[in-house]
Each structure stands twice: as structure tokens, then as C-alpha cells.
Amino acid sequence: MKVSYHGHSVVKIETEGKTIVIDPFITGNGLTDLSVDDLKVDVILLTHGHNDHVGDTLQLAKQNDALVIAPFELATYLSWKGVKVHEMHIGGAHQFEFGHVKLTQAFHGSSYTEENQTIVYTGMPSGILFTAEGKTIFHAGDTALFSDMKLIGERNTIDVAFLPIGDNFTMGPEDAAVAAEWLQAKTVVPIHYNTFPVIEQDPVAFAESLSGKKGRALAVGEAIEL
């Protein structure tokens, strides 16, 4: 399995001949190396409905005939837009041909803002546990620190955890460091930083602050082989 980071909260997973993208915010993301027109994707996983996470889901799903997996209300909304979806909810898990997906809670909001400034409720935000080839990835989505991260760490052997560090909208570096300790992940990668001035952070300093040398600040496009 290969897992790569592509700016903001965009993570790409390549496993068993499939390409999976989490929160594909590409258009308007000044940090990404991806192109919507060139990206080939089989599955899209969404943590919540905010525009900087749904991103280019509709175009990618339609041009690739990709499956979108998301919390129930968000998935339902996207199905009305003409894409294939699999609806899930927090605490639920499902075994797909390409891997096992489980949604965890996240402490945040979830809504999608239409071009006419209508705000659409898109359910509860979530984190994602993805397991394939005997390896588990945790994408926390947008979230505050919460104590059940201890339980997530106790019940899962997490190989790579992607944690937001931007502050303001999510937990900042100090809280993310506590989350890293509670999750007990083998490797912790910071996400959701430096896309906008209000979430400017130093990912290298965060990675170096973690005990056990498990922090790793990935450059855009850089991958981890598992």
C-alpha cells in the first residue's frame, strides 16, 4: 500500500490496484500537486461536507465513475447530484472489495455552501479508519481533541494517522500532539495547515515535537510505503 499527501487534507491511497482519495479539495487548493482533469480515482472517501473537503468530488466521481463513501446525509445529497454513493454513519463499518472502512466521530461541523450562498446541512462530521493489506490508516478529518481518541488507539493498531494541526477551525499543534499520544499510531502526519493564513503552522516543528520520532511532515506529493 502507498499513501501520499497532497496539500490541505487530501490523502491518496493506492492499494490492490485501486486508487482512493480522501477529501479531494483540489480546485482552489494552492498547495496541491494534483490536477482534477488528470486524476484517476476509483473511490472517494469524505469526512464531512465542508467545501474544502468535498472539493472536486462531483467532477472526479462523474469523470471516473468513482464510488463516493460518506456520512449518510452528505452521501444522500451527492447522490441527488448524480454520483454513485455508499452511505455510512459514525460507528459503522463496511468491508469493500478494496478494503475495510469505519467511520469514527469527529468534533466539528458539516455543511455545504452552494454557489447561491445556500448552506446545506450534511450530517455529522467523521474520521475514517481504512484498513487494507493488513495496514490501517486513520484520517481524523477536521476535529477538536476528544478523549475517545484513546479508545480509537486502544482498539486499533494504526500504522499512519493524519491529524489536523491548523488551529482556529480544528485542533492546533498542542492538542494534536496529545491526540498522537492517545492514538498510539506508528507514524503521525500533520494535515490541514498553511492553505489559508488563519491556519498557518510549522509542520516540521510539530513532527519533531512528537515523542518516539513518529512524527513525519510529508512534502506535497510525498508518499509512505506500507
Curated annotation (Swiss-Prot):
Gene Ontology MF terms: hydrolase activity
Keywords from the UniProt entry: Hydrolase
UniProt-listed SMART domains: Lactamase_B (SM00849)
Name of one Pfam family that matches: Lactamase_B_2
Family affiliation: Belongs to the UPF0173 family.
Name by which UniProt lists this protein: UPF0173 metal-dependent hydrolase BH3178
Organism, as annotated: Halalkalibacterium halodurans (strain ATCC BAA-125 / DSM 18197 / FERM 7344 / JCM 9153 / C-125) (Bacillus halodurans)
